[in-house]
Amino acid sequence: MIDADRLITAVGGRDRDEQLDRAIRPLSLADYIGQPTVREQMELFIQAARGRSEALDHTLIFGPPGLGKTTLANIIAQEMGVSIKSTSGPVLERPGDLAAILTNLEPNDVLFIDEIHRLSPIVEEVLYPAMEDFQLDIMIGEGPAARSIKLDLPPFTLVGATTRAGMLTNPLRDRFGIVQRLEFYNIADLSTIVARSAGILGLVIEPAGAFEIARRARGTPRIANRLLRRVRDFAQVRGNGQITRQTADKALNLLDVDEHGFDHQDRRLLLTMIEKFDGGPVGVDSLAAAISEERHTIEDVLEPYLIQQGYIMRTPRGRVVTRHAYLHFGLNIPTRMGEMPVAGEFVDDAADL
């Protein structure tokens, strides 16, 4: 199992960190940094919906963890001037759980369902008419006396978030009028996010210090903010409280986060593939067993950034490390790698192996 306190994981952390995350989240599209295409499109859609005094179309937001799906959902509600009710797929175990939330929505409210790909089929069936016709079909009674009744719902916007859009059923996916994919952030945008967060937290940070944190944050705002808080601790105890490039570098080296944003678990994954599987190809289940992790942890937490940076490829035969992985560890590149495809030639769908 992955360490819940792993510094550079993009999954949720400790309660204290989550409270600070909420404190530094942007509340409007004007404050939302990065994702320029998504921001421009959502600004247009929201302005149009408000002009018609209608609920915004149902919106699906997907992408790797930590890129701001929850933040964007809250911004949508804020920009629409409505309330937001938040829940998650695993929490909605029975149709009655969903019905209780839907019947308490006000007109044009936002219902945010995180991890929407984990909805049970029976709950998903109830959601279809609610999304399409704003009606709720519920069963009253049991056995021969059971009957179905329809309840009218006020117009609302469902915002679904998922890290695994491919696991959504086609009927559910087709009911979203707006689909947005969040991409990993570039270093410039992450530097701006770090500087903004530092200002909110009352920290003194130099641009070079913000850049140093940003370049090791794996393209993920949540990780950037978490690193900022740990560098703050280092600067407070072993420095003068000011975050410079040198301070950030020393702090992150102490925390075992290297210049590429890799920690010991990333390096363990890559070295396992190189040393135990000769660089691959290796199936994800075999890899999970070798490093004592769960399959979904590799697919959702460890792999995405390594693939995006070109250190791992998904091929029809399994996962394969690239030249970059050998160079990262100062290892000799096998001669056979001259015959291998370049990173990115194979599509992600190729390896559920």
From Swiss-Prot:
DNA binds at R295, R314, R319. The RuvA-RuvB-RuvC complex processes Holliday junction (HJ) DNA during genetic recombination and DNA repair, while the RuvA-RuvB complex plays an important role in the rescue of blocked DNA replication forks via replication fork reversal (RFR). RuvA specifically binds to HJ cruciform DNA, conferring on it an open structure. The RuvB hexamer acts as an ATP-dependent pump, pulling dsDNA into and through the RuvAB complex. RuvB forms 2 homohexamers on either side of HJ DNA bound by 1 or 2 RuvA tetramers; 4 subunits per hexamer contact DNA at a time. Keywords: ATP-binding, Cytoplasm, DNA damage, DNA recombination, DNA repair, DNA-binding, Hydrolase, Nucleotide-binding. One of its GO terms (molecular function) is ATP binding. Residues 259-353 are annotated as: Head domain (RuvB-H). SUPFAM superfamilies: P-loop containing nucleoside triphosphate hydrolases, Winged helix' DNA-binding domain. Residues 186-256 are annotated as: Small ATPAse domain (RuvB-S). It comes from Pseudomonas syringae pv. tomato (strain ATCC BAA-871 / DC3000). This is Holliday junction branch migration complex subunit RuvB. Has 3 domains, the large (RuvB-L) and small ATPase (RuvB-S) domains and the C-terminal head (RuvB-H) domain. The head domain binds DNA, while the ATPase domains jointly bind ATP, ADP or are empty depending on the state of the subunit in the translocation cycle. During a single DNA translocation step the structure of each domain remains the same, but their relative positions change. The gene is ruvB. Mg(2+) binds at T70. PANTHER family: HOLLIDAY JUNCTION BRANCH MIGRATION COMPLEX SUBUNIT RUVB, PTHR42848. It catalyses: ATP + H2O = ADP + phosphate + H(+). GO terms for biological process: DNA recombination; DNA repair. It is an enzyme of class 3 (hydrolase). ATP binds at I24, R25, G66, K69, T70, T71, E132, D133, F134, R175, Y185, R222.
